[in-house]
């Protein structure tokens, strides 16, 4: 299979780099890459949001802040490259063609953000579409897709399996609420729907059982075309 992994920045760097988790995740990804072609996109997480918040105090524009966030995603990507060692393409990949070329070299391409206005969720979905991937695995600090934001509503229910069009409806509704961060951003959800790529949304615990995850055995959400 060809698999794209979308790894949230807050999963790797909750407050500071989680060395134990990054080490174990690097091992899992390395082993998976022995039997499958994989590509990885890493987000900025809490660190990126903190930098962007500080930049806002200097009245910087949104595009400037997007570029700042992109730099943080690439720093996080470099940490994962270090953990993957010789299996990784040696530098952060900046575009989809470069990712494809890295795969042809039997290396694991690791990306951060690419362009202002695109979250790393959207980059992951676009990369999966570009590579004609068989599977997109989203690793986040929420263990699946819920009917509402579980951090805001403790009565929110996890959805074990859903259609991509229903994902679009849920994240679009939640994204319209002030202060709410959705598990997958609306643009990424729309790309997942149009591309028809099977997608799994999993939490940090399942991330260390990737052989089970790619077989569909996990506690997250399965999103079908």
Swiss-Prot record:
Annotated GO biological process: 'de novo' CTP biosynthetic process; UDP biosynthetic process
Cellular compartments annotated: Cytoplasm
UniProt-recorded Gene Ontology molecular function terms: ATP binding; UMP kinase activity
Catalytic activity: UMP + ATP = UDP + ADP
Pathway info: Pyrimidine metabolism; CTP biosynthesis via de novo pathway; UDP from UMP (UMPK route): step 1/1
Keywords (A to Z) from UniProt: ATP-binding, Cytoplasm, Kinase, Nucleotide-binding, Pyrimidine biosynthesis, Transferase
Disulphides: none
Activity regulation description: Inhibited by UTP.
Binding site for UMP: 44, 66, 114-120
Pfam families associated with the record: AA_kinase
Biological role stated in the UniProt entry: Catalyzes the reversible phosphorylation of UMP to UDP.
NCBIfam families tied to this protein: pyrH_arch
Family: Belongs to the UMP kinase family.
Subunit and interaction comment: Homohexamer.
Protein name as annotated: Uridylate kinase
């Amino acid at each position: 299979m060809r698999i794209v992994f979308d790894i949230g920045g807050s999963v790797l760097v909750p407050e500071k780099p989680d060395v134990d988790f990054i080490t174990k995740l690097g091992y899992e990804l390395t082993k998976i890459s022995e039997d499958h072609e994989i590509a990885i996109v890493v987000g900025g997480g809490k660190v990126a949001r903190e930098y962007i918040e500080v930049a806002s105090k200097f009245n910087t524009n949104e595009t400037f802040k997007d570029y700042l966030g992109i730099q943080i995603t690439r720093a996080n990507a470099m940490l994962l490259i270090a953990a993957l060692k010789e299996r990784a393409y040696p530098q952060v990949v900046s575009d989809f063609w470069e990712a494809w070329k890295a795969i042809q070299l039997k290396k694991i391409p690791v990306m951060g953000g690419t362009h202002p206005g695109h979250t790393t969720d959207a980059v992951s979905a676009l990369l999966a579409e570009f590579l004609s991937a068989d599977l997109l695995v989203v690793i986040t600090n929420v263990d699946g897709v819920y009917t509402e934001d579980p951090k805001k509503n403790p009565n929110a229910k996890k959805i074990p399996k859903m259609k991509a069009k229903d994902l679009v409806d849920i994240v679009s509704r939640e994204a319209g609420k002030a202060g709410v961060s959705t598990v997958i951003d609306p643009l990424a959800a729309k790309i997942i729907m149009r591309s028809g790529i099977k997608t799994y949304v999993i939490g940090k615990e399942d991330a260390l059982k990737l052989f089970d995850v790619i077989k569909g055995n996990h506690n997250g959400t399965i999103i079908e075309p």
